[in-house]
């Protein structure tokens, strides 16, 4: 029988984060070496590695339970999103603009989960929360990159639904597969801008202790307290970038859905109205889960009376970061008739092949 730790290492290699993005990490090393030696007081020792603490109040007897929870969460998320990608790749009938967005979102969810979760599992399974300095900065960049990417993908999804519902006759001309592919590729590139600026800023700043990160992974708000010296400019720039990449798309999403709701209410066909509204409600649920908790967390620094304990803050961050990645493929598979029909046909085909064998 396979021991739990062996099973964990089979699916979640301890150094998975350290193997991601060698070129990016090399760039971070180069940028870090540009720091002048007078930035750090000689009395300080420069940090070479960080330690992920996770939930600071969690008792050791619950470590294995938490590790198992995140391990099962990770496997389920990756398998569910990979299934969605495979269905799209094998079924030519699904190669439409709407499904191109779904696949892009699925790949983004796989990327974010793979960057964020394995080290958290290692922290509680093998009590190994250490990350090299540049590996931590790389993780910080990728965490915010995939968060920004998801925001842009949700904007693209809202734009697609807006054109499909408000301009149904012009939609096939306005939104072709080539147009949507170019739009999604642009999202994957543009999403690097603000996280890249923040990461380069951190790479040029002095970290001189302590090195414990009170969070589930390396990210801007958890790294800032570890910087020596004044961080107001960097923190202000990071907040400005986060607000822009999150809430500018959200504003356009809200406007597009207001237009969609108006168009739905004008529909003469009651059955078509219900079907269209159901599709939009599904996407609205995903958007709400993604944005509302983020707004709550990012707003706390501006309200001194609104305080969150580290455990609640970490739990809230994990909720809005990881839950959409888990439920997205299941919601779209269960609520999209074309995907349900294809999965049903696969199952029936499997049942027919098995007796023949």
Q: Whereabouts are the PLM-identified features?
A:
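Transmembrane helical core of 7TM receptor-like proteins
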Residues: 1-357
């Amino acid at each position: 029988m396979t021991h739990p730790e062996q099973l964990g290492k089979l699916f979640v290699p301890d150094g998975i984060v350290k193997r991601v993005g060698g070129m990016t990490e090399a760039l971070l090393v180069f940028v870090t070496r540009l720091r002048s030696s007078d930035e750090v007081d000689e009395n300080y020792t420069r940090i070479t590695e960080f330690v992920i603490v996770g939930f600071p109040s969690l008792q050791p007897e619950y470590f294995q339970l938490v590790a198992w929870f995140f391990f099962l969460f990770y496997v389920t998320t990756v398998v569910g999103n990979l299934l969605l990608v495979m269905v799209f790749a094998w079924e030519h009938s699904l190669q439409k603009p709407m499904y191109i967005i779904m696949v892009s979102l699925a790949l983004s969810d796989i990327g974010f989960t793979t960057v964020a979760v394995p080290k958290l599992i290692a922290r509680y399974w093998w009590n190994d929360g250490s990350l090299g300095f540049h590996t931590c900065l790389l993780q910080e960049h990728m965490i915010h990159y995939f968060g920004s990417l998801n925001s842009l993908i949700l904007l693209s999804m809202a734009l697609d639904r807006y054109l499909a519902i408000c301009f149904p006759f012009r939609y096939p001309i306005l939104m072709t597969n080539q147009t949507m592919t170019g739009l999604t590729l642009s999202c994957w590139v543009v999403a690097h801008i603000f996280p890249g600026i923040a990461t380069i800023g951190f790479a040029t700043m002095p970290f001189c202790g302590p090195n414990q990160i009170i969070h589930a992974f390396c990210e801007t708000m958890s790294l800032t307290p570890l910087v020596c010296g004044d961080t107001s400019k960097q923190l202000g720039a990071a907040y400005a970038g986060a607000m822009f990449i999150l809430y500018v798309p959200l504003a356009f999403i809200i406007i597009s859905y207001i237009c969609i709701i108006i168009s739905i209410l004008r529909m003469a066909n009651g059955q078509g109205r219900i079907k269209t509204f159901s599709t939009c409600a599904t996407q609205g649920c995903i958007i709400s889960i993604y944005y509302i908790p983020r707004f709550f967390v990012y707003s706390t620094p501006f309200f001194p009376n609104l305080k969150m304990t580290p455990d609640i803050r970490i739990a809230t961050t994990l909720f809005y970061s990881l839950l959409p990645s888990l439920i997205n493929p299941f919601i779209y598979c269960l609520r999209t008739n074309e995907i349900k029909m294809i999965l049903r046909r696969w199952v029936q085909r499997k049942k027919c092949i098995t007796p023949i064998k």
